[in-house]
Amino acid sequence: MDFYGRREQYGGYGGYGGGGALATPGYAPAAPYGMSQVNIEGNGCGRTLPPQPTVKVYCRANPNYAMTARNGAVVLAPANPKDEYQHWIKDMRWSTSIKDEEGYPAFALVNKATGQAIKHSLGQSHPVRLVPYNPEVMDESVLWTESRDVGNGFRCIRMVNNIYLNFDAFHGDKYHGGVRDGTDIVLWKWCEGDNQRWKIQPYY
């Protein structure tokens, strides 16, 4: 039985097969509507990310909730496209040079409202964190990858340097009452839950 109280049929590290392997800068002009221009001030760099579409991040457990930055944490909240804290930039600047062990490209998720990036947690069951983002510096601790499709276009979002720890809407599975306003995003091994299957979808 794991931390969630689920039994062995949820698979531990073997959800996709063997050993947990997934089977499965500069000035920029004003951004047009639907695009985001984020001033990144982390580490005093004061750089600006080029205008680019923002994305919504949500899990299959309840697509009516979206990932948001709240009080320095990353949680789920009722989806509201007018809430800039629910808008994220999927920064792919390192995607051609950094990939995970399965060859999937790395990206950072930067919050439009705060300019902070999602950083790896301290380990399994710990929440992910928000940190100042410097787009000029390659920081592996803020880089993530997506897995192959794990059903209906949803994918795992996992650490670039440890694909066995995935985004997990904590206790957002049906056995714990589902997603709620304020559900924490933690990292967890693959347990085949809908609260571990994510979409990163552009706002239109």
UniProtKB/Swiss-Prot annotation:
Expressed in shoots and lamina. Residues 54-200 form the Ricin B-type lectin domain. SUPFAM superfamilies: Ricin B-like lectins. Induction: Induced by abscisic acid (ABA) and salt stress in shoots. Keywords: Lectin. InterPro entries: Ricin_B-like_lectin_EULS3-like (IPR040249), Ricin_B-like_lectins (IPR035992). GO terms for molecular function: carbohydrate binding. The keyword Cell cycle does not apply. Transmembrane segments: none annotated. CDD domains: beta-trefoil_Ricin_AtEULS3-like. The keyword Oxidoreductase does not apply. Signal peptide: none annotated. The ricin B-type lectin domain binds glycan structures. Lectin which binds carbohydrates in vitro. Interacts through its lectin domain with glycan structures containing specific motifs. This is Ricin B-like lectin R40G3. It comes from Oryza sativa subsp. japonica. The lineage of its organism: Eukaryota, Viridiplantae, Streptophyta, Embryophyta, Tracheophyta. The gene is R40G3.
